[in-house]
Amino acid sequence: LSFSTFGSGGRDETIELIRGAIERVRAEQPEMKIEGEMQLDEAVNREIGLKQWHSSQDSESEPEVTGRANVLICPDLNAGNILYKALEQFGGFVAAGPILQGFKAPVSDLSRGSSQSDVLLVLETMRKLVSVNQQEKE
């Protein structure tokens, strides 16, 4: 996620980091469907996403993920924390996190407001992530 969509934000340092991360994922996981950088509304609303896509691309093809995203990656911890708490509080979503990646094992920094069920959900999610990571190493 970004304040920019498909290059609309120019050469901002944060956008360049996001673009670099997207290219790295594409190189390391070519089967993964990933698109970006994009604003939240374009990521989850197909009509808005396609409108922006067609105004920024020379191609007649349509994106697969735009407007249909089921995973949202935030550019930093601040944005991620704000997003997940807003989704919980305003949208009625259940959050399993935050779960931080990039360490030897998943790490969670639970909110002081977490309930017992929140803690159990995060622990179960992290257990599954560790299991998947171990299977990938084998």
Model-derived regions: residue spans:
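Glycine-rich phosphate/diphosphate-binding loop of Rossmann-like nucleotide-binding domains
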Residues: 1-41
